[in-house]
């Protein structure tokens, strides 16, 4: 089991609660088979908890109760599986086009006992529009916001929110994507911070509201 600092352990307990053992098991998958099968780089192991898993999981602060969530470009389950672990009330669909990643995700979902909560689609986001019914779309490290908006906003079918985990370039990306977002039906775009009460470095999230979805 990967060791955690006291601060990270406290944050993990706060975020995952009684599902912390499952989160720990997920991190072990990332640190072993996730590396062996090319889903995550070996240099990321020392910071799996704070830089990746907790960084993603705190986004649940921005998601309403009992929401249906589609995670685009799920890769190693970041942020989709982290959200599922942190919030048992959420219904999560992982959308990932690469077969080897979907195979790994399927194995991990089964091992964690999340099959009733998490569904996997092996397809591109554009192909999932007619397959997915969701109120929230999430993505992390997929592409720049202007391109990403075109892949994700259509999944909301005119109403909901898109949450993109971003870094310091968030404001600049919003400016570049403004025209595309408006054309796609985005009604408001904000830069929000999640996890400020539990993380030393909170997560920056770009939120795009679509239709009547206002918080």
Swiss-Prot record:
Molecular function GO labels: rRNA (guanine-N7-)-methyltransferase activity
Superkingdom to which the source organism belongs: Bacteria
UniProt xrefs under SUPFAM superfamilies: S-adenosyl-L-methionine-dependent methyltransferases
Record GO cellular component, one term: cytosol
Keywords: Cytoplasm, Methyltransferase, rRNA processing, S-adenosyl-L-methionine, Transferase
Keyword field contains rRNA processing: yes
The keyword Cytoplasm is annotated on this UniProt entry: yes
Documented EC number(s): 2.1.1.-
Protein name, per record: Ribosomal RNA small subunit methyltransferase G
Biological classification of the source: Bacteria, Bacillati, Actinomycetota, Actinomycetes, Micrococcales
Gene: rsmG
């Amino acid at each position: 089991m990967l060791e955690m600092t006291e601060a990270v352990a406290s944050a993990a307990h706060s975020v995952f609660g009684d599902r912390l053992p499952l989160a720990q098991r997920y991190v072990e998958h990332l640190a072993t088979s996730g590396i062996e099968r090319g889903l995550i780089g070996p240099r990321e192991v020392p910071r799996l908890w704070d830089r990746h898993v907790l960084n993603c999981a705190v986004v649940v602060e921005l998601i309403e109760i009992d929401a249906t969530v589609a995670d685009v470009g799920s890769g190693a389950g970041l942020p989709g599986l982290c959200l599922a672990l942190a919030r048992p009330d959420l219904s999560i669909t992982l959308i990932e086009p690469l077969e080897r990643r979907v195979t790994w995700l399927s194995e991990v979902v089964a091992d964690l006992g999340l099959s009733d909560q998490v569904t996997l689609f092996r397809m591109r986001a554009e192909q999932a529009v007619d397959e997915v019914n969701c109120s929230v779309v999430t993505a992390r490290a997929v592409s720049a916001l202007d391109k990403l908006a075109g892949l994700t906003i259509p999944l909301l079918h005119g109403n909901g929110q898109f949450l993109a985990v971003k870094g310091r370039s968030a404001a600049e990306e919003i400016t570049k994507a403004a025209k595309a977002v408006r054309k796609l039906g985005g009604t408001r775009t904000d830069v929000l911070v999640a996890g400020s009460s539990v993380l030393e470095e909170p997560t920056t999230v770009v939120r795009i509201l679509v239709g009547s979805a206002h918080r």
